[in-house]
Amino acid sequence: SHKLFTVYCRPVREKIRTMIEGFDDISHGGLPVGRTTLVSGTSGTGKTLFSLQFLFNGISYFEEPGVFVTFEESPHDIIKNAHIFGWDLQGLINDGKLFILDASPDPEGQDIVGNFDLSALIERLQYAIRKYRAKRVVIDSITAVFQQYEAVGVIRREIFRLVARLKQLNVTTIITTERTEEYGPVACFGVEEFVSDNVVIVRNVLEGERRRRTVEILKLRGTTHMKGEYPFTITNEGVNIFPLGAMRLTQRSSNVRVSSGVKTLDDMCGGGFFKDSIILATGATGTGKTLLVSKFIQNGCQNGERAILFAYEESRAQLSRNASSWGIEFEDLERQGLLKIICTYPESTGLEDHLQIIKSEIADFKPSRIAIDSLSALARGVSNNAFRQFVIGVTGYAKQEEITGFFTNTTDQFMGSHSITDSHISTITDTILMLQYVEIRGEMARAINVFKMRGSWHDKGIREYNITADGPEIKDSFRNYERIVSGAPTRVSIDEKAELSRIVKSFQDKDSSDASS
Protein backbone atom coordinates (compact mmCIF):
# COMPACT_ATOMS: atom_id res chain seq x y z
CA SER A 1 0.00 0.00 0.00
CA HIS A 2 2.92 2.30 0.70
CA LYS A 3 4.32 1.74 -2.82
CA LEU A 4 0.95 2.48 -4.40
CA PHE A 5 0.80 5.73 -2.43
CA THR A 6 4.28 6.67 -3.63
CA VAL A 7 3.36 6.05 -7.27
CA TYR A 8 0.08 7.96 -7.30
CA CYS A 9 0.93 10.77 -4.87
CA ARG A 10 1.63 14.08 -6.59
CA PRO A 11 5.29 15.01 -6.03
CA VAL A 12 5.81 17.95 -3.69
CA ARG A 13 8.79 20.27 -4.19
CA GLU A 14 11.48 19.58 -1.61
CA LYS A 15 11.84 22.27 1.01
CA ILE A 16 14.69 23.43 3.19
CA ARG A 17 13.75 24.14 6.80
CA THR A 18 14.61 27.60 8.09
CA MET A 19 14.20 26.62 11.77
CA ILE A 20 12.94 30.17 12.34
CA GLU A 21 10.25 29.84 15.01
CA GLY A 22 6.85 29.66 13.30
CA PHE A 23 8.03 30.26 9.72
CA ASP A 24 8.23 26.58 8.78
CA ASP A 25 4.61 26.26 9.95
CA ILE A 26 3.23 29.03 7.76
CA SER A 27 5.40 27.99 4.79
CA HIS A 28 4.36 24.33 5.15
CA GLY A 29 7.90 23.13 5.75
CA GLY A 30 10.32 25.90 4.80
CA LEU A 31 11.66 27.41 1.57
CA PRO A 32 11.83 25.48 -1.75
CA VAL A 33 15.31 24.00 -2.25
CA GLY A 34 17.47 25.64 -4.91
CA ARG A 35 15.13 28.61 -5.35
CA THR A 36 15.44 32.34 -4.64
CA THR A 37 13.27 34.07 -2.03
CA LEU A 38 12.81 37.82 -1.92
CA VAL A 39 12.39 39.21 1.62
CA SER A 40 11.01 42.73 1.33
CA GLY A 41 10.21 45.31 3.99
CA THR A 42 10.64 48.91 5.11
CA SER A 43 13.66 49.96 7.15
CA GLY A 44 13.89 48.24 10.55
CA THR A 45 11.43 45.42 9.87
CA GLY A 46 13.97 42.64 10.49
CA LYS A 47 14.98 41.60 6.94
CA THR A 48 18.70 41.24 7.65
CA LEU A 49 18.01 39.45 10.92
CA PHE A 50 15.63 37.00 9.21
CA SER A 51 18.14 36.17 6.48
CA LEU A 52 21.09 35.91 8.88
CA GLN A 53 19.07 33.58 11.11
CA PHE A 54 18.31 31.45 8.03
CA LEU A 55 22.07 31.05 7.45
CA PHE A 56 22.99 30.53 11.11
CA ASN A 57 20.28 27.88 11.63
CA GLY A 58 21.39 26.04 8.49
CA ILE A 59 24.88 25.72 9.92
CA SER A 60 23.76 24.97 13.49
CA TYR A 61 21.01 22.42 12.77
CA PHE A 62 21.99 20.86 9.45
CA GLU A 63 25.74 21.48 9.00
CA GLU A 64 24.94 23.39 5.80
CA PRO A 65 27.64 26.04 5.09
CA GLY A 66 26.48 29.49 4.00
CA VAL A 67 27.62 32.62 2.16
CA PHE A 68 26.46 36.12 3.13
CA VAL A 69 26.86 38.88 0.50
CA THR A 70 26.57 42.35 2.00
CA PHE A 71 25.97 45.47 -0.10
CA GLU A 72 25.27 47.73 2.90
CA GLU A 73 26.83 46.92 6.28
CA SER A 74 30.47 46.04 6.76
CA PRO A 75 31.29 42.43 7.79
CA HIS A 76 32.56 43.79 11.13
CA ASP A 77 29.17 45.36 11.92
CA ILE A 78 27.28 42.22 10.89
CA ILE A 79 29.43 40.03 13.16
CA LYS A 80 29.07 42.53 16.02
CA ASN A 81 25.26 42.79 15.69
CA ALA A 82 24.88 39.00 15.60
CA HIS A 83 26.51 38.75 19.04
CA ILE A 84 23.34 40.31 20.54
CA PHE A 85 21.52 37.07 19.68
CA GLY A 86 24.34 34.82 20.87
CA TRP A 87 25.49 33.95 17.34
CA ASP A 88 29.27 33.59 17.04
CA LEU A 89 29.70 34.34 13.33
CA GLN A 90 33.46 34.85 13.66
CA GLY A 91 33.78 31.33 15.04
CA LEU A 92 31.80 29.95 12.08
CA ILE A 93 34.01 31.92 9.67
CA ASN A 94 37.13 30.52 11.34
CA ASP A 95 35.70 26.99 11.04
CA GLY A 96 35.09 27.47 7.31
CA LYS A 97 31.31 27.15 7.67
CA LEU A 98 30.43 30.77 6.85
CA PHE A 99 31.87 33.26 4.38
CA ILE A 100 30.94 36.96 4.29
CA LEU A 101 31.50 38.49 0.86
CA ASP A 102 31.96 42.24 1.27
CA ALA A 103 30.36 44.22 -1.57
CA SER A 104 29.57 47.26 0.61
CA PRO A 105 30.34 50.76 -0.74
CA ASP A 106 33.87 52.07 -0.58
CA PRO A 107 34.09 54.40 2.44
CA GLU A 108 36.33 56.73 0.38
CA GLY A 109 33.31 57.37 -1.84
CA GLN A 110 35.07 56.93 -5.19
CA ASP A 111 33.18 57.92 -8.31
CA ILE A 112 31.61 55.12 -10.32
CA VAL A 113 33.33 54.77 -13.68
CA GLY A 114 32.20 52.65 -16.62
CA ASN A 115 29.25 50.38 -17.15
CA PHE A 116 27.62 48.52 -14.26
CA ASP A 117 28.58 44.85 -14.35
CA LEU A 118 28.10 42.15 -11.70
CA SER A 119 30.36 39.66 -13.50
CA ALA A 120 33.22 40.00 -11.02
CA LEU A 121 30.86 39.63 -8.05
CA ILE A 122 29.12 36.62 -9.62
CA GLU A 123 32.48 34.91 -10.17
CA ARG A 124 33.61 35.63 -6.58
CA LEU A 125 30.29 34.36 -5.25
CA GLN A 126 30.45 31.20 -7.38
CA TYR A 127 34.02 30.56 -6.19
CA ALA A 128 32.98 30.96 -2.51
CA ILE A 129 29.93 28.68 -2.94
CA ARG A 130 32.07 25.93 -4.46
CA LYS A 131 34.97 26.37 -2.04
CA TYR A 132 32.79 26.24 1.08
CA ARG A 133 30.23 23.84 -0.46
CA ALA A 134 27.55 26.30 0.56
CA LYS A 135 23.90 25.28 0.50
CA ARG A 136 22.45 28.62 1.63
CA VAL A 137 23.17 32.12 0.30
CA VAL A 138 21.98 35.57 1.44
CA ILE A 139 22.28 38.80 -0.57
CA ASP A 140 21.61 41.90 1.58
CA SER A 141 20.36 44.08 -0.02
CA ILE A 142 19.91 44.68 -3.75
CA THR A 143 18.27 48.06 -3.05
CA ALA A 144 21.73 49.40 -2.22
CA VAL A 145 22.88 48.46 -5.75
CA PHE A 146 20.00 50.37 -7.36
CA GLN A 147 20.73 53.39 -5.18
CA GLN A 148 24.41 53.46 -6.22
CA TYR A 149 23.83 53.28 -9.96
CA GLU A 150 21.45 55.11 -12.27
CA ALA A 151 21.12 52.56 -15.10
CA VAL A 152 18.09 50.76 -13.61
CA GLY A 153 17.46 48.67 -16.74
CA VAL A 154 21.05 47.38 -16.77
CA ILE A 155 20.92 46.58 -13.05
CA ARG A 156 17.71 44.58 -13.50
CA ARG A 157 19.41 42.52 -16.20
CA GLU A 158 22.46 41.92 -14.00
CA ILE A 159 20.32 40.91 -10.99
CA PHE A 160 18.43 38.48 -13.23
CA ARG A 161 21.79 37.03 -14.35
CA LEU A 162 22.90 36.67 -10.72
CA VAL A 163 19.69 34.82 -9.77
CA ALA A 164 20.03 32.51 -12.79
CA ARG A 165 23.61 31.60 -11.79
CA LEU A 166 22.55 30.88 -8.20
CA LYS A 167 19.81 28.58 -9.52
CA GLN A 168 22.41 26.72 -11.62
CA LEU A 169 24.51 26.23 -8.50
CA ASN A 170 21.41 24.75 -6.74
CA VAL A 171 21.75 26.94 -3.65
CA THR A 172 18.75 28.18 -1.66
CA THR A 173 18.98 31.98 -1.66
CA ILE A 174 17.41 34.88 0.22
CA ILE A 175 17.65 38.34 -1.35
CA THR A 176 16.54 41.30 0.77
CA THR A 177 15.12 44.52 -0.62
CA GLU A 178 13.70 47.77 0.76
CA ARG A 179 10.20 49.09 0.20
CA THR A 180 8.91 52.56 1.00
CA GLU A 181 5.38 51.71 2.17
CA GLU A 182 4.03 48.98 4.45
CA TYR A 183 1.15 48.36 2.06
CA GLY A 184 2.15 49.18 -1.50
CA PRO A 185 4.53 47.92 -4.21
CA VAL A 186 6.54 44.86 -3.18
CA ALA A 187 9.83 46.70 -3.69
CA CYS A 188 11.14 50.15 -4.58
CA PHE A 189 12.07 49.47 -8.19
CA GLY A 190 9.01 47.49 -9.12
CA VAL A 191 10.44 44.39 -10.77
CA GLU A 192 12.56 42.68 -8.12
CA GLU A 193 9.69 40.30 -7.36
CA PHE A 194 9.75 39.00 -10.95
CA VAL A 195 13.30 37.66 -10.58
CA SER A 196 12.34 35.67 -7.50
CA ASP A 197 10.38 32.44 -7.18
CA ASN A 198 9.19 33.31 -3.70
CA VAL A 199 8.25 36.59 -2.00
CA VAL A 200 8.05 37.19 1.76
CA ILE A 201 6.98 40.59 3.11
CA VAL A 202 7.83 41.79 6.62
CA ARG A 203 6.00 44.79 8.09
CA ASN A 204 6.20 47.01 11.15
CA VAL A 205 2.85 48.80 11.06
CA LEU A 206 1.68 51.52 13.45
CA GLU A 207 -1.72 50.35 14.72
CA GLY A 208 -3.30 52.76 17.14
CA GLU A 209 -0.51 53.77 19.50
CA ARG A 210 1.75 50.75 19.04
CA ARG A 211 3.74 49.19 16.25
CA ARG A 212 2.93 45.65 15.22
CA ARG A 213 5.30 43.38 13.32
CA THR A 214 3.84 40.94 10.79
CA VAL A 215 5.16 38.58 8.13
CA GLU A 216 3.29 37.53 4.98
CA ILE A 217 4.23 34.94 2.36
CA LEU A 218 3.08 36.52 -0.90
CA LYS A 219 4.08 33.55 -3.04
CA LEU A 220 6.02 30.27 -2.90
CA ARG A 221 6.19 29.08 -6.48
CA GLY A 222 5.24 25.45 -7.04
CA THR A 223 4.23 24.74 -3.45
CA THR A 224 1.60 25.55 -0.83
CA HIS A 225 1.76 28.01 2.04
CA MET A 226 -0.55 29.77 4.48
CA LYS A 227 -2.14 33.02 3.37
CA GLY A 228 -2.33 36.31 5.22
CA GLU A 229 -0.26 38.21 7.78
CA TYR A 230 1.10 36.58 10.93
CA PRO A 231 2.40 38.54 13.93
CA PHE A 232 6.02 38.15 14.96
CA THR A 233 8.40 39.57 17.49
CA ILE A 234 12.16 39.86 17.80
CA THR A 235 13.55 38.23 20.94
CA ASN A 236 17.09 37.62 22.16
CA GLU A 237 16.98 34.44 20.07
CA GLY A 238 15.97 36.17 16.83
CA VAL A 239 12.72 36.26 14.85
CA ASN A 240 9.76 34.49 16.48
CA ILE A 241 6.59 34.15 14.37
CA PHE A 242 3.20 33.21 15.84
CA PRO A 243 1.54 30.89 13.29
CA LEU A 244 -1.98 31.41 14.66
CA GLY A 245 -3.65 30.01 11.55
CA ALA A 246 -1.55 26.84 11.83
CA MET A 247 -2.99 26.07 15.27
CA ARG A 248 -5.26 23.07 15.17
CA LEU A 249 -8.14 22.30 17.52
CA THR A 250 -6.72 18.85 18.23
CA GLN A 251 -6.26 19.05 21.99
CA ARG A 252 -8.08 16.46 24.07
CA SER A 253 -11.12 17.62 26.01
CA SER A 254 -10.93 16.65 29.65
CA ASN A 255 -13.93 15.63 31.75
CA VAL A 256 -11.88 16.27 34.88
CA ARG A 257 -13.14 19.21 36.95
CA VAL A 258 -11.05 21.71 38.87
CA SER A 259 -12.34 23.93 41.64
CA SER A 260 -12.74 27.68 41.28
CA GLY A 261 -11.86 28.01 44.96
CA VAL A 262 -15.46 29.07 45.72
CA LYS A 263 -17.76 26.16 46.65
CA THR A 264 -21.00 27.87 45.59
CA LEU A 265 -19.51 28.85 42.22
CA ASP A 266 -18.41 25.24 41.68
CA ASP A 267 -22.01 24.15 42.31
CA MET A 268 -23.26 26.77 39.84
CA CYS A 269 -20.89 25.29 37.23
CA GLY A 270 -22.03 21.72 37.75
CA GLY A 271 -19.05 20.71 39.88
CA GLY A 272 -16.33 23.18 38.92
CA PHE A 273 -14.54 24.28 35.75
CA PHE A 274 -13.33 21.75 33.22
CA LYS A 275 -9.58 21.20 33.33
CA ASP A 276 -7.85 22.76 30.27
CA SER A 277 -10.77 25.17 29.73
CA ILE A 278 -10.63 28.96 29.40
CA ILE A 279 -12.78 30.97 31.82
CA LEU A 280 -13.62 34.66 31.36
CA ALA A 281 -14.93 36.82 34.22
CA THR A 282 -16.34 40.03 32.82
CA GLY A 283 -17.78 43.03 34.65
CA ALA A 284 -17.34 46.63 35.72
CA THR A 285 -14.51 47.71 37.99
CA GLY A 286 -14.98 46.63 41.63
CA THR A 287 -17.32 43.72 40.90
CA GLY A 288 -14.86 41.16 42.28
CA LYS A 289 -13.06 39.80 39.22
CA THR A 290 -9.58 39.92 40.77
CA LEU A 291 -10.98 38.26 43.91
CA LEU A 292 -12.25 35.31 41.86
CA VAL A 293 -8.86 35.09 40.13
CA SER A 294 -7.12 35.08 43.53
CA LYS A 295 -9.34 32.27 44.86
CA PHE A 296 -8.76 30.27 41.65
CA ILE A 297 -4.98 30.67 42.00
CA GLN A 298 -5.04 29.88 45.75
CA ASN A 299 -7.05 26.69 45.21
CA GLY A 300 -4.59 25.41 42.62
CA CYS A 301 -1.59 26.09 44.84
CA GLN A 302 -3.29 24.44 47.85
CA ASN A 303 -3.61 21.31 45.71
CA GLY A 304 0.11 21.39 44.93
CA GLU A 305 -0.39 22.82 41.42
CA ARG A 306 1.79 25.57 40.02
CA ALA A 307 0.17 28.80 38.86
CA ILE A 308 1.18 32.03 37.10
CA LEU A 309 -0.65 35.32 37.48
CA PHE A 310 -0.05 37.88 34.71
CA ALA A 311 -1.20 41.26 36.07
CA TYR A 312 -1.50 44.33 33.84
CA GLU A 313 -3.40 46.72 36.11
CA GLU A 314 -2.00 46.38 39.63
CA SER A 315 1.47 46.16 41.15
CA ARG A 316 2.77 43.09 42.96
CA ALA A 317 2.53 44.86 46.34
CA GLN A 318 -1.06 45.91 45.69
CA LEU A 319 -2.09 42.42 44.57
CA SER A 320 -0.47 40.83 47.62
CA ARG A 321 -2.08 43.34 49.99
CA ASN A 322 -5.55 42.86 48.53
CA ALA A 323 -5.24 39.08 48.51
CA SER A 324 -4.00 39.12 52.10
CA SER A 325 -7.16 40.98 53.18
CA TRP A 326 -9.12 37.92 51.95
CA GLY A 327 -6.80 35.48 53.73
CA ILE A 328 -4.76 34.61 50.62
CA GLU A 329 -0.99 34.89 51.12
CA PHE A 330 0.56 35.26 47.66
CA GLU A 331 4.05 35.84 49.06
CA ASP A 332 3.98 32.52 50.95
CA LEU A 333 2.86 30.70 47.80
CA GLU A 334 5.70 32.34 45.85
CA ARG A 335 8.25 31.29 48.47
CA GLN A 336 6.98 27.71 48.18
CA GLY A 337 7.65 27.83 44.44
CA LEU A 338 3.97 27.28 43.60
CA LEU A 339 3.13 30.77 42.33
CA LYS A 340 4.77 33.25 40.00
CA ILE A 341 3.39 36.79 39.65
CA ILE A 342 4.40 38.86 36.63
CA CYS A 343 3.33 42.52 36.70
CA THR A 344 3.91 44.82 33.74
CA TYR A 345 2.31 47.83 32.08
CA PRO A 346 0.35 46.90 28.93
CA GLU A 347 1.92 49.85 27.10
CA SER A 348 5.47 48.70 27.91
CA THR A 349 5.64 46.63 24.71
CA GLY A 350 3.57 45.30 21.81
CA LEU A 351 1.01 42.49 22.03
CA GLU A 352 3.34 40.08 20.20
CA ASP A 353 6.00 40.67 22.85
CA HIS A 354 3.45 40.16 25.64
CA LEU A 355 2.40 36.89 23.97
CA GLN A 356 6.03 35.80 23.70
CA ILE A 357 6.62 36.58 27.40
CA ILE A 358 3.51 34.58 28.40
CA LYS A 359 4.60 31.57 26.30
CA SER A 360 8.17 31.77 27.61
CA GLU A 361 7.07 31.98 31.27
CA ILE A 362 4.68 29.04 30.81
CA ALA A 363 7.42 26.97 29.16
CA ASP A 364 9.85 27.72 32.01
CA PHE A 365 7.51 27.42 35.03
CA LYS A 366 5.19 24.69 33.68
CA PRO A 367 2.02 25.75 35.55
CA SER A 368 -1.31 23.90 35.68
CA ARG A 369 -3.22 27.18 35.98
CA ILE A 370 -2.70 30.67 34.58
CA ALA A 371 -4.61 33.90 35.12
CA ILE A 372 -4.56 37.17 33.17
CA ASP A 373 -5.88 40.28 34.94
CA SER A 374 -7.01 41.84 32.71
CA LEU A 375 -7.43 41.37 28.98
CA SER A 376 -9.12 44.75 28.61
CA ALA A 377 -5.93 46.49 29.78
CA LEU A 378 -4.04 44.84 26.92
CA ALA A 379 -6.71 45.90 24.42
CA ARG A 380 -6.00 49.60 24.94
CA GLY A 381 -4.56 51.31 21.88
CA VAL A 382 -4.56 48.26 19.57
CA SER A 383 -6.85 47.16 16.75
CA ASN A 384 -9.59 44.59 17.31
CA ASN A 385 -7.88 42.19 14.92
CA ALA A 386 -4.51 42.41 16.70
CA PHE A 387 -6.19 41.90 20.08
CA ARG A 388 -8.21 38.93 18.85
CA GLN A 389 -5.06 37.33 17.44
CA PHE A 390 -3.36 37.82 20.81
CA VAL A 391 -6.25 36.16 22.68
CA ILE A 392 -6.28 33.26 20.18
CA GLY A 393 -2.52 32.88 20.67
CA VAL A 394 -2.81 32.75 24.48
CA THR A 395 -5.85 30.45 24.61
CA GLY A 396 -4.47 28.16 21.91
CA TYR A 397 -1.14 27.79 23.71
CA ALA A 398 -2.85 27.22 27.09
CA LYS A 399 -5.03 24.46 25.62
CA GLN A 400 -2.04 22.93 23.84
CA GLU A 401 -0.18 22.76 27.16
CA GLU A 402 -3.34 21.48 28.94
CA ILE A 403 -3.54 24.48 31.25
CA THR A 404 -6.68 25.92 32.85
CA GLY A 405 -6.86 29.65 32.15
CA PHE A 406 -8.84 32.29 34.05
CA PHE A 407 -9.00 35.72 32.37
CA THR A 408 -10.74 38.92 33.40
CA ASN A 409 -12.28 41.63 31.25
CA THR A 410 -13.31 45.05 32.58
CA THR A 411 -16.36 46.60 30.94
CA ASP A 412 -16.95 50.33 30.56
CA GLN A 413 -20.61 50.19 31.58
CA PHE A 414 -21.02 50.57 35.33
CA MET A 415 -24.57 49.24 35.51
CA GLY A 416 -26.90 47.42 33.17
CA SER A 417 -26.18 44.97 30.40
CA HIS A 418 -22.84 45.21 28.64
CA SER A 419 -21.34 43.73 25.51
CA ILE A 420 -19.09 40.73 25.91
CA THR A 421 -18.71 40.19 22.19
CA ASP A 422 -16.17 42.97 21.61
CA SER A 423 -13.21 41.55 19.66
CA HIS A 424 -15.11 38.23 19.74
CA ILE A 425 -13.47 37.20 23.04
CA SER A 426 -16.68 35.47 24.09
CA THR A 427 -16.46 32.95 21.23
CA ILE A 428 -12.92 31.94 22.17
CA THR A 429 -13.62 31.21 25.85
CA ASP A 430 -15.33 28.10 27.24
CA THR A 431 -16.98 29.59 30.33
CA ILE A 432 -18.19 33.14 30.91
CA LEU A 433 -18.99 34.57 34.35
CA MET A 434 -20.91 37.85 34.28
CA LEU A 435 -20.46 40.15 37.28
CA GLN A 436 -22.46 43.35 37.59
CA TYR A 437 -23.97 45.95 39.88
CA VAL A 438 -27.74 46.14 40.43
CA GLU A 439 -29.86 48.53 42.46
CA ILE A 440 -32.28 46.83 44.87
CA ARG A 441 -34.54 48.95 47.08
CA GLY A 442 -32.23 51.96 46.90
CA GLU A 443 -29.03 49.99 47.66
CA MET A 444 -26.21 48.75 45.45
CA ALA A 445 -25.81 45.00 45.21
CA ARG A 446 -23.57 42.74 43.15
CA ALA A 447 -24.86 39.97 40.90
CA ILE A 448 -23.12 36.93 39.38
CA ASN A 449 -24.33 34.70 36.59
CA VAL A 450 -22.80 31.76 34.70
CA PHE A 451 -23.58 33.20 31.27
CA LYS A 452 -22.14 30.30 29.30
CA MET A 453 -20.41 26.98 29.94
CA ARG A 454 -19.53 24.66 27.10
CA GLY A 455 -20.33 20.97 27.52
CA SER A 456 -21.91 21.18 30.96
CA TRP A 457 -25.10 21.95 32.85
CA HIS A 458 -24.84 25.21 34.75
CA ASP A 459 -27.03 27.33 36.98
CA LYS A 460 -29.03 29.82 34.90
CA GLY A 461 -29.97 31.99 37.87
CA ILE A 462 -28.68 35.48 38.59
CA ARG A 463 -27.40 35.35 42.15
CA GLU A 464 -26.58 37.96 44.72
CA TYR A 465 -22.88 38.19 45.41
CA ASN A 466 -21.13 39.81 48.39
CA ILE A 467 -17.46 40.43 49.08
CA THR A 468 -16.59 39.69 52.71
CA ALA A 469 -13.39 39.48 54.73
CA ASP A 470 -13.28 35.76 53.89
CA GLY A 471 -13.72 36.34 50.16
CA PRO A 472 -16.75 35.95 47.90
CA GLU A 473 -20.11 34.94 49.31
CA ILE A 474 -22.66 33.87 46.69
CA LYS A 475 -26.27 33.88 47.89
CA ASP A 476 -29.58 32.77 46.37
CA SER A 477 -31.03 34.05 43.14
CA PHE A 478 -32.75 37.43 43.08
CA ARG A 479 -36.13 35.73 43.45
CA ASN A 480 -39.17 37.86 42.72
CA TYR A 481 -37.13 40.30 40.61
CA GLU A 482 -36.86 40.50 36.88
CA ARG A 483 -34.79 42.56 34.42
CA ILE A 484 -31.75 42.23 36.71
CA VAL A 485 -29.35 42.15 33.76
CA SER A 486 -30.69 45.43 32.38
CA GLY A 487 -29.67 47.19 35.60
CA ALA A 488 -33.26 48.31 36.28
CA PRO A 489 -34.79 45.37 38.19
CA THR A 490 -38.50 45.37 38.92
CA ARG A 491 -40.24 43.44 41.67
CA VAL A 492 -42.62 40.74 40.49
CA SER A 493 -45.94 40.59 42.37
CA ILE A 494 -46.44 37.11 43.81
CA ASP A 495 -49.26 35.05 45.16
CA GLU A 496 -48.30 34.76 48.87
CA LYS A 497 -50.28 31.55 49.33
CA ALA A 498 -48.58 29.94 46.32
CA GLU A 499 -45.16 31.07 47.53
CA LEU A 500 -45.82 29.63 51.03
CA SER A 501 -46.81 26.27 49.51
CA ARG A 502 -43.62 26.30 47.41
CA ILE A 503 -41.45 26.85 50.50
CA VAL A 504 -43.28 24.11 52.48
CA LYS A 505 -42.95 21.71 49.53
CA SER A 506 -39.22 22.37 49.23
CA PHE A 507 -38.74 21.50 52.93
CA GLN A 508 -40.85 18.33 52.51
CA ASP A 509 -38.78 17.27 49.51
CA LYS A 510 -35.58 17.86 51.48
CA ASP A 511 -36.88 15.83 54.47
CA SER A 512 -37.93 12.93 52.24
CA SER A 513 -34.56 12.86 50.46
CA ASP A 514 -32.71 12.91 53.82
CA ALA A 515 -34.89 10.03 55.09
CA SER A 516 -34.22 7.92 51.98
CA SER A 517 -30.48 8.44 52.27
Q: Which role does the model predict for each range below?
A:
Residues I26-L92, M268-F330:
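Walker A/P-loop NTP-binding active-site region of P-loop NTPases
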Residues T37, V113-F194, V199, L291, ...:
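P-loop NTPase motor core
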Residues E72-H76, I84, S104-E108, T143-V145, ...:
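Conserved nucleotide-binding/hydrolysis micro-motifs of P-loop NTPases
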Residues F62-Y149, E305-Q389:
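Conserved inter-motif catalytic segment of the P-loop NTP-binding fold
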Residues G34, F62-P65, G96, L169-V171, ...:
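Short glycine-/polar-rich loops that comprise or flank the Walker A/P-loop
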Residues L291, I297, E313, S506-S517:
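Terminal-proximal interaction/regulatory segments of ATP-powered molecular machines
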Residues R13-E14, E123, Y127-Y132, N204-K263, ...:
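Conserved P-loop NTPase
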